[in-house]
C-alpha cells in the first residue's frame, strides 16, 4: 500500500466518523426517533432524556458517558455489560501503558538505523517495499544481530508485565462485582432457588418420572426440597403455540385496519394469502384462535402425561441449598443425575436438556472437528481474496483490469478499502453458523452457547484473519518456496508479519472510525424502523417490535475486539505505531458503547459476569501468540538472546493457571457465602416455579395477569425479542 492510499483511507474514515457523529446529535433530538436512540430507557419506564438535557452541544453524550458510574451500567444494562466495559478499560490500560514506554523509545531506535537503506528486501518491509515512511519506524529498519534489538526484547517483557498486572487487577474487580451483584439483588432471582438435573435414570416400575425425581431429592434434602419441573418434549406443542401467537397478531392487524378504515378486511386462505377462498379476516382469525386454543389445551395434557424427558428443574426453599446442590456429586456414576446450576428461565435451550451425558461428549468432539475443518476450508477463499486484493497480485490474476487499476484515483481507492472490506464481508457470514454448531453440542443455556460461539469465532479470526491474511499477501511469491521447504512455515510467518502491518493499521482504523460511527449514529436501524412503521406496522405491538434494539451481541462483538487485541499485541513491538490505533479503538469503543448500553441495548440474559473467564483466557492466548511471534521474529533477525523470551512464555502459562485456580471457582458456581445473604424481600416460591414453565405449557386462563415479578421479568422481554 502506498503512503497516499494509507492517508486517504485514514482521512476519509475520520471524516465519515465526524459526519456520522454530528448526524447522531441531530437525529437523536428528534421526537420521532426516540425509540431508536433511547429504547432501553423507554422499556424501563424512564424519560428518554433523564439525567441529560436537549442541549445543542454535539459532545454532550460524551460527558454523560464519562460521568456514568459502573452501578449506572449495572442498573440499566446488567452485570454482563459492566463486565464487558471492564474488558474494554483493561485492554485500553494495557495498550496505553505499553505506548507510554514503547513509542518514545522504540521509534527513535528504529528511525535512526539504516537497514532498509543498505538492504531493500521486499520480505522485510511493512508494505511490500513502497511504504518507506513507516518502514523506517518499525523493526524492519533494524539491522540483523544489532545490539538495538535488546530494546525490542525488553519491550516484549514490558508489554507482558503490564498485561499480567492489568489482568490480575481486572479479575479481582470482576469477581467482587459478581459477588456484590448476587448478594444485593433487589429482585428474587428464580435461578438461585433451582438446579438443573440431567441424565435422570429410568424410573422404577409404577412411578412416573416426576414422582421418581421428587422422591430422589426429597430423600437427600428432606427439609428444603420444594418441587420439581420435569422437562417434556415440546416440539409439537411449541408449533401450536407459535401458530396461535401468529393468529393473534394477524387478528390484531385486522382489527386495527377495521378501526382505521371502517371496512372489514378480507384475505385469501391459501398459500401466502395469494390463492384460495376470500374470507372476512376478523372472523377467520377468531375461528383459528379458538381452534388453536382447543388444540393447545389438549396437547398440554398429552405432553405432561406422556412426554416427560430425562431432565428436570428442581426447586428448593432457600438459595444456600440450591447452591450447595449444584456443586455436589449426587451419584457415583458420572453419567447419572448430573446436576448444575439452573440458568435463567429465558436462557434455557429446552431441546438440548434431554441429550445424554456421553452423547454430549461425542457431540462436542464432532463439533470441534467440524470447526477445525471449517477453519481450514474457509482459509482458502480468505487467503485467495486477500492475495488478489493486493493490486500487484490483482493485476497478475486479472490482467484485463490493468488499464483501470492504473488510473491514480481508482488505484488509491482500491488500495485504501478493497482488502479490508473483502475481509469484513467474509467474516460477516460466520456467526449464525457457529451459533448453530455451539447449540448442537447440547449446551443447556443461551449464555453458555454465546460463550462457546465467541470462542470458536475468536480462534477462527486469529487463524484465518491474522495468520491467513499475513501469509496470503505473499502467497503467490512464496508458495513455491513453501512447497520445496515445508519446514520454513514459521520463518515465512515471521518474515511476512512486518509487511502486513499497514494492512492491519488500515483495518483497525476502518473498524473504529466507520464501525463505531455507524454504531453511534444507528443509521441502518433508524431507516429500517421508519420503513417498517410506515409500510408494515399496523398495531402498537408491531411498532414496539420494530424498534426493539436487542443486546450487545457478545457472540460477535467480543471476538471482533479480540481480533483487534491480537493484531495490536503482535505488532506492538514490530510496528509500535499500531498501539496508537489500538488505544483509539478501545477508547472510542468504551465511550460509544457506554452510551449505547445506557440508552439503547437491552440485555437478553444475565449471567453475572460468567463471560469474564472466557475473555481472560483469550487475552492470555493473544499474549502467548505475541510472545511466540516475537521469539520467531527476533530469531529471523539472528538475535541469539531471543532465547530469553522462553521463560516469559512459561510465565504466561503459569499466570493463567494461577488465575484459574484462584478465581474461576467463583464463576463456575455461586459461593455459599454469597448465597447465604438474606434477601430484601421474601421469595414467592410459586412464582419462582412458574417462571420456568415454557410459554406453550402456561395456562391461558384469566388469572394469568396476577403473576408479576419473576414472570414479568423473564417472559415479557422474551416474548418481544422472540417475536
Curated annotation (Swiss-Prot):
Cytoplasmic face of the membrane: 1-5, 112-148, 386-416, 478-508, 594-614, 659-723
InterPro entries named among the record's database cross-references: Csc1-like, CSC1/OSCA1-like_7TM, CSC1/OSCA1-like_cyt, Csc1/OSCA1-like_N
GO molecular function, one term: calcium-activated cation channel activity
Cellular component GO terms, alphabetical: chloroplast membrane; plasma membrane
Cysteine-cysteine disulfides: none
Primary localisation category: plastid
Extracellular side: 27-90, 170-364, 438-456, 530-572, 636-637
Claim: Nucleus is one of the keywords in the record: no
The UniProt record lists the keyword Ion transport: yes
Keywords associated with the record: Calcium, Chloroplast, Ion channel, Ion transport, Membrane, Plastid, Transmembrane, Transmembrane helix, Transport
Lipid bilayer topology: Multi-pass membrane protein
Functional note: Acts as an osmosensitive calcium-permeable cation channel.
Recorded family membership: Belongs to the CSC1 (TC 1.A.17) family.
Protein name (database record): CSC1-like protein ERD4
Organism: Brassica juncea (Indian mustard)
Name of the coding gene: ERD4
